Amino acid sequence: LKKYQTTHHLTDSDLEMYQRIMDELKKQIIYLNELTNKSRNLKKIEQVELGVASAKGIFKHLVKYPEAITHFSDFLYHKVPEILRASERFLSIKEDKLSTEEITLATNGILSTIRVLSESITDDYERLVSEASEEIALSKKLVERKNG
């Protein structure tokens, strides 16, 4: 842990806050995965939008680059909590096994919200991958110039 702290230039308070944020994020992603697996509708959204998989990818990135956490405040404090709340609401309504036109409209609205949030999380991850790809391409060009 000390090596990690030193390598990433984290103060004791930075490390404590980082650990707290990452512990919470890990729990949230695990819980989101569990919720997703409880519903065919939620599984379908995940198969198309890849929100849970993308959240896991962002988590891995933040483990490797803790200084990047400041770039993911919307992901951490809005998108993940909101997709969890929406998934819980959807499953709660489905568990009641009541079906009216109003309930169907409400659940469809919730699913739409989940889809949009999932897509947005995947957009965040795609941006991450794109930035990494650009950095690698730039490094390659610099090496080629140096060697050429």
Question: Residues of each region from the PLM?
Answer:
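Membrane-proximal, non-transmembrane interface segments of integral membrane proteins
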Residues: 1-63
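Soluble C-terminal extramembrane regulatory/interaction domains of multi-pass membrane proteins
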Residues: 46-148
